[in-house]
């Protein structure tokens, strides 16, 4: 905990103090640590805190120990992601695990995570949004939310236990920075994976794939020959609809099992999911997978009133969750729900997101041409994006300090929709006189975030939980698209003067409460903390206060 070393997780400081010197609960220890880090509480702070340690206005500090379940996907650079439980394989319960991993912060910029904490088993809760996005963590895990603070839409950290239905959580949706084209073999395996998950099967003795799009079918067969090779059979037959169905049949699956597609062997439709190797692949590889997947079981259609829908259907709940999450990694917002027939659907239901899907991902065959035609046939202003910043319009109209003519323009126009800001942002800002209001509006509408409405916070059982230590100013990282947070601390140089030469027989030591270690009776304290920072207390009915001295 020395000031010349990196910050340590607050929970670790509390745990060591409680284990060695104070076996009476952790709350009082953490409260003391927080107070010693607050410059408004102590004239000379003794703890150098990193993260949320409260505010002079009595905003509470973040919790010392808050963590996520092991299945939470941590965003990495170049479109890669990893389960937080896989960051340090074999990590023991209640352990700190050093390492170096680049993760993305709340803005989508790369920062270093140098430690994984396995925090043991704790009661967890699942936060789910109206679109179906979800994250699971301990009750005191903080995520970034959009809060109406005295009429001002403000980004604030909220604990899961504080989040209620109709609150708004922040999802990071900046498209990934890509490092170049995909490795050809990885891309071919991703193409085969998407095709076989959607339109194929693989048992212990046989595998197959079929599709009516001849060009798409030929691409899958070519990928199979390049990655797997060996004897396979192709055929055609006319089905009831009159379409020609192209079929690939594989009788010997031993070579196929030897590839990364072997995870599909014997998998039931309801059990399908995205394998971990694909999550850890860069965006270019994931794009090939999604193109093949949507070309198989995906669809696009023009709907009444100049609207459009892109959808994917599956029998697997987990696959639907995975597809929605992977779309979010490309910045595409979708909605997930269970259809009446028992299938799970992932749908994109507005023009802006359909256009983003078409440019960032797209279908892998003839369906892409159909999507392009539908989008091209829509009137210029049809199907505007419904994504908005809750409370922004009312805030601007109330605090813009503009002339009457500009106020009237702001009142008549829809100024909380992100599509409006993308198109007319400069004009909206020109009609806002207050520079602070302009700054807040610009920050909330730059497109990095999606503000998702919470529908439920439910118990998810006792599970192993994990956290990361991130070396950045706000110590934030992305999990399932949600923005997560942490706190850490270390001693200040001034506090070291209270401990200086403590190991050179300057003070007496006695056994601690259980006799395992020694503890000092007093501190050497070259820095007179009692006088400099003051103190207060009450005993035998009398209050005593020592004011701080310079």
UniProtKB/Swiss-Prot annotation:
Molecular function GO labels: ATP binding; DNA binding; DNA negative supercoiling activity; endonuclease activity
A GO term from the CC aspect: DNA topoisomerase type II (double strand cut, ATP-hydrolyzing) complex
Subcellular location as annotated: Cytoplasm
EC annotation from Swiss-Prot or TrEMBL: 5.6.2.2
Catalytic activity: ATP-dependent breakage, passage and rejoining of double-stranded DNA
Active site: residue positions: 66 (o-(5'-phospho-dna)-tyrosine intermediate)
Post-translational modification remark: This protein undergoes a protein self splicing that involves a post-translational excision of the intervening region (intein) followed by peptide ligation.
SMART domains: HintC, HintN, TOP4c
Coiled coil: none
Keyword vocabulary terms for this entry: ATP-binding, Autocatalytic cleavage, Cytoplasm, DNA-binding, Isomerase, Nucleotide-binding, Protein splicing, Topoisomerase
Superkingdom of this protein's organism: Bacteria
Residue stretches making up the Topo IIA-type catalytic domain: 1-550
GO term, biological process aspect, one: intein-mediated protein splicing
Residue ranges of every copy of the DOD-type homing endonuclease domain listed in the record: 192-332
Family: Belongs to the type II topoisomerase GyrA/ParC subunit family.
PANTHER family listed in its UniProt record: DNA GYRASE SUBUNIT A, CHLOROPLASTIC_MITOCHONDRIAL (PTHR43493:SF5), DNA GYRASE/TOPOISOMERASE SUBUNIT A (PTHR43493)
More about this protein: Few gyrases are as efficient as E.coli at forming negative supercoils. Not all organisms have 2 type II topoisomerases; in organisms with a single type II topoisomerase this enzyme also has to decatenate newly replicated chromosomes.
Family matches, as NCBIfam families: intein_Cterm, intein_Nterm
Function: A type II topoisomerase that negatively supercoils closed circular double-stranded (ds) DNA in an ATP-dependent manner to modulate DNA topology and maintain chromosomes in an underwound state. Negative supercoiling favors strand separation, and DNA replication, transcription, recombination and repair, all of which involve strand separation. Also able to catalyze the interconversion of other topological isomers of dsDNA rings, including catenanes and knotted rings. Type II topoisomerases break and join 2 DNA strands simultaneously in an ATP-dependent manner.
Record note on quaternary structure: Heterotetramer, composed of two GyrA and two GyrB chains. In the heterotetramer, GyrA contains the active site tyrosine that forms a transient covalent intermediate with DNA, while GyrB binds cofactors and catalyzes ATP hydrolysis.
This protein's name: DNA gyrase subunit A
Lineage of the species this protein comes from: Bacteria, Bacillati, Actinomycetota, Actinomycetes, Mycobacteriales
């Amino acid at each position: 905990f020395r000031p010349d070393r990196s910050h340590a997780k607050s929970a670790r400081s509390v745990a060591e103090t409680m284990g060695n010197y104070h076996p009476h609960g952790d709350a009082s220890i953490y409260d003391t640590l927080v107070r010693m880090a607050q410059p408004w509480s102590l004239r000379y702070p003794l703890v150098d805190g990193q993260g949320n340690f409260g505010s002079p206005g009595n905003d509470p500090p973040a919790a010392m120990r808050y963590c996520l379940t092991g299945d939470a996907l941590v965003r990495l650079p170049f479109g890669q992601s990893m389960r937080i439980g896989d960051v340090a394989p074999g990590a023991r319960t209640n352990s700190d695990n050093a390492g170096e991993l680049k993760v993305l912060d709340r803005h989508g910029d790369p920062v270093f995570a140098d430690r994984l904490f396995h925090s043991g088993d704790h009661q967890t809760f699942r936060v789910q949004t109206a679109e179906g996005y979800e994250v699971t963590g301990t009750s005191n895990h903080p995520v970034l939310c959009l809060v109406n603070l005295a009429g001002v839409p403000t980004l604030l950290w909220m604990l899961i236990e504080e989040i209620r239905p109709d609150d708004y959580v922040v999802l990071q949706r900046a498209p990934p920075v890509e490092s170049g084209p995909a490795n050809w073999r990885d891309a071919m395996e991703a193409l085969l994976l998407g095709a076989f998950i959607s339109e194929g099967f693989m048992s212990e003795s046989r595998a197959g794939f079929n599709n009516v799009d001849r060009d798409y079918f030929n691409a899958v067969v070519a990928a199979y020959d390049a990655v797997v090779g060996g004897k396979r059979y192709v055929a055609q037959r006319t089905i009831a609809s009159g379409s020609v169905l192209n079929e690939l049949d594989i009788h010997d699956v031993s070579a196929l099992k030897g590839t990364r597609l072997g995870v599909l062997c014997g998998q039931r439709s309801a059990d399908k999911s995205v394998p971990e190797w694909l999550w850890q692949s860069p965006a270019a590889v994931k794009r090939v997978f999604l193109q093949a997947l949507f070309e198989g079981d995906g669809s696009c259609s023009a709907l009444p009133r100049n609207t459009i829908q892109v959808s994917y259907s599956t029998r697997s709940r987990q696959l639907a969750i995975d597809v929605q999450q992977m779309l979010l990694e490309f910045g595409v917002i979708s909605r997930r729900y269970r259809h009446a027939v028992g299938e799970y659907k992932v749908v994109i239901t507005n023009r802006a997101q359909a256009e983003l899907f078409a440019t960032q991902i797209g279908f892998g065959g003839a369906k892409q041409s159909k999507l392009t035609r539908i989008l091209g046939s829509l009137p210029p202003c049809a199907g505007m994006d419904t994504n908005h910043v809750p409370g922004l319009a009312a805030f601007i109209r109330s605090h813009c300090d503009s002339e009457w003519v500009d106020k009237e323009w702001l009142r008549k126009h829809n100024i909380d929709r992100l599509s409006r800001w993308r198109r007319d942002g400069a004009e909206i800002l020109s009609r806002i006189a207050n520079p602070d209001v302009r700054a807040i509006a610009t920050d909330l509408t730059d497109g990095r975030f999606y503000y998702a409405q919470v529908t439920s916070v439910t118990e998810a059982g006792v599970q192993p939980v994990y956290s990361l230590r991130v070396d950045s100013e706000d110590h934030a990282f992305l999990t399932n698209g949600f923005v997560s947070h942490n706190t850490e601390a270390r001693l200040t140089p001034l506090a070291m003067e209270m401990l200086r030469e403590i190991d050179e027989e300057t003070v007496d030591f006695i056994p601690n409460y259980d006799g395992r270690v020694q503890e000092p009776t007093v501190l050497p304290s070259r820095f007179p903390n009692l006088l400099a920072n003051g103190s207060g207390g009450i005993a035998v009915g009398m209050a005593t206060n020592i004011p701080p001295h310079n």
